[in-house]
Structures are given as C-alpha cells and as structure tokens.
C-alpha cells in the first residue's frame, strides 16, 4: 500500500460553490477523506491578470490554457467589481465538508493579497491576515482551526514565525521532501510542516504534456516508503477536470495508492521529526518564489 496525503486548495468563490460539492461527491464515491484548505475572505483572484506582464506568468497561463481551464468568472473576479466574501456567503459548504469527515484548514483570508504581498509584509501584517482568516473559519466551523496552508506556497521564515501563536497542529506551507519542524529564529523547532512533493496539474501540463496524459504522468510519481503529498484545486479538478480526477482516483486504488488527510501523515510524537529550514526558492512550472524545505 502506498500512503498519500491529498490536499485540496480552494482559492475562489466559484471553486467553493461549484467545485467543492463535486469533489465531496467524488471522494465519497471512492470512500476517501482529504484535507480541504479554504480561502474565506474576498475573492480578488482576477487581479492576478496584471501579472500577465511578467513573461513567466504569461507563459504559465498560455501553457495551461487558463481561460478554458478556470473560466472567465474566476479569471476576472475582483477586478471590475468588489470580490465576493467567500466565507460569509458559502460557510455552509465548509461546514458540510467538515461534517463529511474531511480535515478542514485555512488557506488564506485574501488569496490574491497573500500571494502578491506576503514577501514584503511585516510579521505583524502577516499575522493580521492569518488572524482574520482563522477567526472567520473558526466562526464558520464552530471550533478552532487546526491546520493551514499558505496561498501559493508563499512562505519563508517570517511566515513560520507569524503562524506560531495560532496553535495550529501543523502547516503545509512549502514544497519539499518529508514532514519536518522548521527552525525558528531563536533556533527552537516550530510547528510541524507537511510539504507537498508532487507537481500540480498547472505546473506540468503544456505542449510537452497534454491534458490527456496527465494522469499517467502523476501516478508514476507516487512511491512506496516515503511521504507522497499531492495537491489538487477545487477550481480545476472540481470543475472542468472532475471526470479526469474521478478516473485518477480509480486508477490510484488499483495501484495501491491510498489517499488520506495530511494530518494523518504526522507521527504521534512530532518531536521525532527532523529540523530543517523553510526558505524561499524556485520551482519549474511556477512563476515567482515559493517556500521550500532546506535541506
């Protein structure tokens, strides 16, 4: 049996409203549980269109055929009109996810703002964004938030420090191999991190890998004897690619891949996890910097 953590990022209003119910159906059909990370504040994701001036982002959007993949309502959200408040309007879907037995955590208050400004915000500004998102999601769920995942994996040592006061059991803020405890500025271990170590659809699909070949590509990258942490997006696998994701789940089962929530990948005693640094790095297929485990 190959154990794998399944992380579902929910970035937008439409992804929550339309993608989450579809994913809940598919996971129930497969008898699986996963971790959903919700964005709960305003949906301003359309403001990323201004990044088209950057060649790397323009190429990524062109390579993944973003307009057909996401839809124009997602690509324009929060541009010509105020972003819709996701948590306030769609909180019942987050409670439904929790009631179905899935792990629920915080992705962001404002996904666009975090992805755009996390690199320059102070620790205090980062903490305020985390507080707003955590308080909102806790009110929706009726219980404290126990895990989080930085939007766009935009995390570094400052983000690690900013999350310390919130009492999360773990965070999934970076890319890299194996769960670890990030080293804080004073040298002490921080809240455990569960990194993602498998590529996402939008990072690899393009002229060299057509959509139809993606399932073959990704399934070959799961391996026994290590942590396998895979991320999908409600806006992608919960909408246009839902049929392909259903087929992926069926094929994964036949290969002995068993998906579970990320929290179940942690040892009973987190003190057994190795210490490592969480630093800024680069990853093929993604525009800009992101958090990576080192070493």
Curated annotation (Swiss-Prot):
Molecular-function GO term, any one: hydrolase activity, acting on carbon-nitrogen (but not peptide) bonds, in linear amides
Catalytic activity: 4-deoxy-4-formamido-alpha-L-arabinopyranosyl di-trans,octa-cis-undecaprenyl phosphate + H2O = 4-amino-4-deoxy-alpha-L-arabinopyranosyl di-trans,octa-cis-undecaprenyl phosphate + formate
Gene Ontology CC terms, in alphabetical order: membrane
An annotated GO BP: lipid A biosynthetic process
InterPro entries xref list: ArnD, Glyco_hydro/deAcase_b/a-brl, NODB_dom, Polysacc_deacetylase_ArnD
UniProt domain NodB homology: residue ranges: 2-260
Pathway: Glycolipid biosynthesis; 4-amino-4-deoxy-alpha-L-arabinose undecaprenyl phosphate biosynthesis; 4-amino-4-deoxy-alpha-L-arabinose undecaprenyl phosphate from UDP-4-deoxy-4-formamido-beta-L-arabinose and undecaprenyl phosphate: step 2/2; Bacterial outer membrane biogenesis; lipopolysaccharide biosynthesis
Alphabetically ordered keywords of this record: Antibiotic resistance, Hydrolase, Lipid A biosynthesis, Lipid biosynthesis, Lipid metabolism, Lipopolysaccharide biosynthesis
This enzyme's EC code(s): 3.5.1.n3
Gene3D superfamilies linked: Glycoside hydrolase/deacetylase
Taxonomic superkingdom: Bacteria
Family under the similarity heading: Belongs to the polysaccharide deacetylase family. ArnD deformylase subfamily.
Role, per record: Catalyzes the deformylation of 4-deoxy-4-formamido-L-arabinose-phosphoundecaprenol to 4-amino-4-deoxy-L-arabinose-phosphoundecaprenol. The modified arabinose is attached to lipid A and is required for resistance to polymyxin and cationic antimicrobial peptides.
Name of the protein described by the UniProt record: Probable 4-deoxy-4-formamido-L-arabinose-phosphoundecaprenol deformylase ArnD
Originating organism: Pseudomonas aeruginosa (strain ATCC 15692 / DSM 22644 / CIP 104116 / JCM 14847 / LMG 12228 / 1C / PRS 101 / PAO1)
